Amino acid sequence: QEAEFAILHDPVFEQVMLVGEGRPFVVLLAVTQETDENVLIRRANDKLRDFPRWTRVRRVIVQKEPWSVNNGLLTPTLKLKRKVTLDNFARELAGLYE
């Protein structure tokens, strides 16, 4: 989660989650208004330059709608429900890892 906090220091990202454990590469789930995947990858990796190489982002899934308690992705204390978020993006993630 430290890597996610580092990425959030870039104002282009509103909310982020890194996915990569047990997978061939890291995908960034991001709430942002930016749509250019190459720009997002570059900006995220700029923030991750002091982290191990395996944390480097190779793909991005963008969502415009913020994650919230109402859509079930945040707890009442505004913590990310990681499992629910993974389930929510399962189809998109499967497509990237095929």
Which role does the model predict for each range below?
Residues Q15, K47-E98:
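Conserved C-terminal "lid"/linker of ANL adenylate-forming enzymes
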Residues Q1-T55, P66, N71:
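AMP-binding/adenylate-forming catalytic core of the ANL superfamily
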